[in-house]
């Protein structure tokens, strides 16, 4: 009897050890919804001053998951981006989780951490709205970047900066996003907008119009990624949009309109896609109408947005839905007055 109890106890201890030492599943990491609390410890002033690309420095990340599991391991971080690096209190960060000393976090690889421009209330609301745009596009297409919301506690190793906390989110790696859709990435590949998958590009163009984002370009690979069907070499690439902080839906204080559009505010919508035929427009507008309830519910159910901001966001989208309810207006915007080059 004592031997049986000892075997049972030993088994429980072993099972507990393996449970505690399991690596993070990178697919589940982005598929699950609960917020993660992360404490990021590094030399913050050094990171703020760094001007180079992918210049990594030592850091420690402690991640507390919704089930109260905690993983704390050494990582490295680097400032990234251009505009927000100059404008914001803390630049966007590239986190390298993979290393020999971080076996549990290593499967996450390198991920972009998107941070608000500051820890003030409005900055965080702006951050949450951009996060919601990614979630909105997830509702429309599997060929989209998944994101995971975090509450990040920043700790400076030299105590030059007082500890502070703010919302942030991690963006799925582009190669992982492609693989999830049976596709591959071809870094450096450049295509003209109309040389990509037409149906996908139609969906992307209307989405960018819906959120009023003029800060993208397919030929320049600016805020879009191309993914290629790995089982069909002759298939045209799919366009996947990202980086929406200059959109009218977000309406960040630092966002300015694309000069090419001739608008006075980022909230003024301009369709940047190419003309579509009326039968194509009927199909895509029906598709967007079918997603209205899910998109509205997503915003209404977001507990991190203030009621006033929720209302503004929904009103802004309702204006889009009002526009696409009129066939004549749709034809004028998405066909007659659309760009041709």
What do the predicted segments below correspond to?
Residues 1-23:
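Bacterial Sec-dependent N-terminal signal peptides
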């Amino acid at each position: 009897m004592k031997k049986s109890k000892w075997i049972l106890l030993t088994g429980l201890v072993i099972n507990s050890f393996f449970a505690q030492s399991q690596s993070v599943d990178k697919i589940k990491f982005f598929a699950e919804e609960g917020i993660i609390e992360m404490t990021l410890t590094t030399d913050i002033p050094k990171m703020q001053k760094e001007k180079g690309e992918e210049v990594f420095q030592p850091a420690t990340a402690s991640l507390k998951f919704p089930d109260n599991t905690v993983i704390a391991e050494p990582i490295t971080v680097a400032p990234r981006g251009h505009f927000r690096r100059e404008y914001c209190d803390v630049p966007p960060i590239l986190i390298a989780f993979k290393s020999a000393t971080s076996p549990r976090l290593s499967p996450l690889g390198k991920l972009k951490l998107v941070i608000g421009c500051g820890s003030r209330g409005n900055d965080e609301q702006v951050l949450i709205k951009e996060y919601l745009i990614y979630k909105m596009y997830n509702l429309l297409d599997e060929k989209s970047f998944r994101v995971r919301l975090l509450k990040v506690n920043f700790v400076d190793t030299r105590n030059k900066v007082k500890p502070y906390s703010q919302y942030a989110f991690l963006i799925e790696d582009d190669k992982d996003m492609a693989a999830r859709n049976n596709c591959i990435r071809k870094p450096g590949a450049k295509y003209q907008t109309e040389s990509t998958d037409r149906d996908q590009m139609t969906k992307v163009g209307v989405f960018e119009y819906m959120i009023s984002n003029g800060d993208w370009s397919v030929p320049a690979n600016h805020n879009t990624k191309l993914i290629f069907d790995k089982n069909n070499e002759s298939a045209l690439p799919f366009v996947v949009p990202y980086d929406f902080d200059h959109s009218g839906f977000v309406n960040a204080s630092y966002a300015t309109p694309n000069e090419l559009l001739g608008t006075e505010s980022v909230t003024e919508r301009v369709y940047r896609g190419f003309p579509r035929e009326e039968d194509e427009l009927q199909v895509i507008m029906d598709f967007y109408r079918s997603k209205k309830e899910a998109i509205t519910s997503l915003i209404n159910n977001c507990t991190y947005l203030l009621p006033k901001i929720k209302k503004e966001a929904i009103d802004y989208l309702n204006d889009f839905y009002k526009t696409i309810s009129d066939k004549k207006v749709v034809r004028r915007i998405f066909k007659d007055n659309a760009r041709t080059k």
